[in-house]
């Protein structure tokens, strides 16, 4: 067996039934990967929200305050339902859209797809289930897919942030949604979308760009190993490490947008819009306020992205092999 046989994605005969089933499976794989990462990493997400809501909020006192509350340790998982819905269905929409965009670009004839040689290096096949695109195409497809998914899931995101925050004493998600609609109208459910899009578009674009580049480099190193079995076992490792590193880099670059987004969603009447929020945050809390929650966000994003993408790619690769043998 050659090295390329380990990573190569089987060619599946294009039929309408196959296209439909593959789209459904991309959605299901994205949902599964998103749900698993959201539930496991909810404490980090909740702590990030609490730290970002005020520059004076330190991590350790925040943890002690939550644990000493009546709910105890369970308080760290407050907001898990909206977080799981947002991340689960958001990931499902994102991966489905990303696959559709990449498949579409790869078959348009536009020079955005890498050749087999340039994509894989010297005989190294890819551990990815997605088509190989150029750097600019990776950037564009990642950004477009994330913004589209973010817009659809925005109401759930606002509910999640409000419910996790200590600013509001919502007893349930229903009461949170009812209060937002009563006091702010439908617009309130989309508070902070501008900052979210400004964060998500570059983040997702940079993530896909870094992720694909890192995978090619790590695959080149794995190719110098000793045989096919070592390559098989390293496929998931390549995806996981690449995902964690790519998320860390993209998160560090885009964290100011995340800090602004959180303030806008918590106090839309005070901050108004993205530019006003930046000015007020810097004036009241200093430039450091734009880096609030960076450590927590890097930790959570690195783990969640690595987990989500590894689970997603492994499920898709297994499905591709199944479809190939069936056809």
From Swiss-Prot:
Signal peptide: none annotated. It is found in: Mitochondrion inner membrane. Solcar repeats lie at residues 21-104, 136-217, 234-318. It holds the Pfam family Mito_carr. It comes from the Eukaryota. One of its GO terms (molecular function) is glycine transmembrane transporter activity. It is a multi-pass membrane protein. Keywords: Membrane, Mitochondrion, Mitochondrion inner membrane, Repeat, Transmembrane, Transmembrane helix, Transport. GO terms for biological process: glycine import into mitochondrion; heme biosynthetic process. Its main location: mitochondrion. Mitochondrial glycine transporter that imports glycine into the mitochondrial matrix. Plays an important role in providing glycine for the first enzymatic step in heme biosynthesis, the condensation of glycine with succinyl-CoA to produce 5-aminolevulinate (ALA) in the mitochondrial matrix. Belongs to the mitochondrial carrier (TC 2.A.29) family. SLC25A38 subfamily. This is Mitochondrial glycine transporter.
């Amino acid at each position: 067996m050659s090295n390329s046989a380990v990573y190569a994605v089987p060619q599946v005969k294009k039929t309408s039934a196959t296209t439909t089933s593959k789209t459904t499976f991309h959605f299901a794989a994205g949902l599964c990967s998103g749900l698993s990462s959201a539930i496991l990493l909810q404490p980090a997400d909740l702590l990030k929200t609490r730290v970002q809501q005020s520059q004076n909020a330190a991590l350790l006192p925040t943890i002690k305050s939550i644990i000493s509350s009546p709910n105890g340790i369970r308080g760290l998982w407050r907001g898990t339902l909206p977080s799981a819905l947002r991340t689960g269905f958001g990931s499902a929409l994102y991966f489905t859209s990303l696959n559709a965009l990449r498949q579409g670009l790869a078959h348009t004839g536009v020079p955005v797809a890498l050749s087999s040689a340039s994509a894989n290096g010297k005989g190294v096949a890819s551990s990815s289930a997605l088509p190989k695109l150029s750097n600019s195409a990776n950037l564009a497809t990642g950004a477009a897919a994330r913004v589209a998914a973010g817009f659809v899931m925005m109401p759930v995101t606002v509910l999640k942030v409000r419910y996790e925050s200590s600013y509001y004493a919502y007893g349930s998600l229903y009461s949170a949604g009812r209060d937002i609609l009563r006091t702010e109208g439908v617009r309130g459910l989309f508070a902070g979308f501008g900052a979210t899009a400004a964060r998500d578009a570059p983040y997702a674009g940079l993530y896909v760009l870094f992720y694909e580049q890192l995978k090619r480099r790590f695959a080149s190193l794995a190719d110098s190993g000793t045989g096919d079995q070592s390559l098989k076992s390293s496929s998931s490792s390549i995806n996981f490490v690449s995902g964690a590193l790519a998320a860390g880099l993209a998160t560090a670059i885009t964290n100011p947008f995340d800090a602004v987004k959180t303030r806008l969603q918590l106090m839309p009447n005070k901050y108004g819009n993205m530019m006003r929020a930046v000015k007020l945050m810097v004036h009241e809390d200093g430039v450091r306020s734009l880096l609030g929650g960076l450590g927590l966000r890097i930790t959570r994003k690195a783990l969640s992205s690595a987990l989500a993408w590894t689970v997603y790619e492994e499920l898709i690769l297994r499905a591709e092999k199944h479809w190939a043998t069936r056809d």
